[in-house]
């Protein structure tokens, strides 16, 4: 029975050796997987840094764009207010023109007979003025002919007297 103890020791040593070899194999596999995970994380970290930079740039651009849009919106609001003011002015002007037109139409309707008489009298006055002018022109024309004939007669008389 003495031989059992050394055999048990050898079996225990072989079992321990198998256990150690199994643990080493598992640890080497875990190390390989951890190295692969570390490389993947390094790549992901680089990508995250790139994404972070791009996101920061995009945020800055978005902020500038927002400020630009706000500025343009403020300027556009002033233009809209000005156009509204112009629209109000045009509307007021249209109301004034309507009131003046209505007033003129009303006054014309009320004074239609008087206006008709004024037009008739002005036509009569223009006819009288035309006739007066025609008469004056005929009289001036007749005076010119008479004075022209008298001058010719006087000239012929003077010429005959001088010739004698």
Swiss-Prot record:
Domain of life: Bacteria
PANTHER family, per database record: UPF0478 PROTEIN YTXG
Biased composition (Polar residues): 143-164
Annotated family: Belongs to the UPF0478 family.
Name this polypeptide is given: UPF0478 protein SSP1024
Keyword terms: Cell membrane, Membrane, Transmembrane, Transmembrane helix
Major subcellular location class: membrane
Annotated TM spans: 7-27
Region: Disordered, residue numbers: 136-164
Pfam family for this entry, one: DUF948
GO cellular component, one term: plasma membrane
UniProt-listed SUPFAM superfamilies: Methyl-accepting chemotaxis protein (MCP) signaling domain
Topology relative to the membrane: Single-pass membrane protein
Disulfide cross-links: none
InterPro entries: UPF0478
Subcellular location: Cell membrane
């Amino acid at each position: 029975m003495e031989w059992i103890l050394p055999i048990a020791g050898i079996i225990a040593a072989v079992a321990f050796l198998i256990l150690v070899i199994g643990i080493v194999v598992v640890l080497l596999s875990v190390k390989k997987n951890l190295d692969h995970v570390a490389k993947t994380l390094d790549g992901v970290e680089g990508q995250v840094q790139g994404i972070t930079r791009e996101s920061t740039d995009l945020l800055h651009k978005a902020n500038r764009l927002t400020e630009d849009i706000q500025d343009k919106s403020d300027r556009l609001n002033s233009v809209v207010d000005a156009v509204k003011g112009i629209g109000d002015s045009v509307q007021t002007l249209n109301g004034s023109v309507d009131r003046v037109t209505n007033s003129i139409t009303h006054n014309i309707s009320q004074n239609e007979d008087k206006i008709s008489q004024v037009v008739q009298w002005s036509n009569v006055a223009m006819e009288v003025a035309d006739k007066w002018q025609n008469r004056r022109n005929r009289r001036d024309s007749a005076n010119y002919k008479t004075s022209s004939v008298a001058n010719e007669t006087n000239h012929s008389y003077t010429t005959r007297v001088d010739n004698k």
